[in-house]
């Protein structure tokens, strides 16, 4: 059975290193189960394989002043923002063993966020040209997806804006798209949410779409 670890608030670099270690174990067969990492990051911009630094509209001096790092990684896509108030899920799944196509997998990530928003009274939709989930008018993005695949094993995942401070999104073209704004579940619903309550619902949806899993306290307990 798969397992899930709630890492709590973790730096992006530390969590990235954790992903790399788990992916290596899953690829080698040392780890024979799929894994979900649930976390939240301090403010950080990440750049995907297509780069995206040209979509950053804030000086390096201002970034340093605000304590926001910029990290280049191998996921798909361009620039995005992570920060407090997001739900970030990194599924490390052996797609090959699951006989799951990448397009099917991305669709399930989108469906996870669509159902999560709906459970709290907010309707969001897919965009056929851009991965992630959006408001019905297609102008605002509430959830971003960026993944990578190594030897049939997925990593990275999605970031869903819950009670997120949206100002840092205004300093970039999110995912390299002009004319797009970011929104959050709190903004769309007009109220803040208890993260613990939303997490509980998220775990239920993940189990429904990807199969049952056990929740473990730490990766150290997983053999």
From Swiss-Prot:
Taxonomy, superkingdom: Bacteria
Residue(s) at site: Lowers pKa of active site Cys: 141
Keywords for the protein's UniProt record, in alphabetical order: Acyltransferase, Cytoplasm, Transferase
Annotated catalytic residues: 175 (acyl-thioester intermediate)
Listed CDD domains: LipB (cd16444)
InterPro entries assigned: aa-tRNA-synth_II/BPL/LPL, BPL_LPL_catalytic, Octanoyltransferase, Octanoyltransferase_CS
An annotated Gene Ontology molecular function: lipoyl(octanoyl) transferase activity
Location within or outside the cell: Cytoplasm
Catalytic activity, reaction form: octanoyl-[ACP] + L-lysyl-[protein] = N(6)-octanoyl-L-lysyl-[protein] + holo-[ACP] + H(+)
UniProt name for this protein: Octanoyltransferase
Natural source organism: Desulfotalea psychrophila (strain LSv54 / DSM 12343)
Gene name of the record: lipB
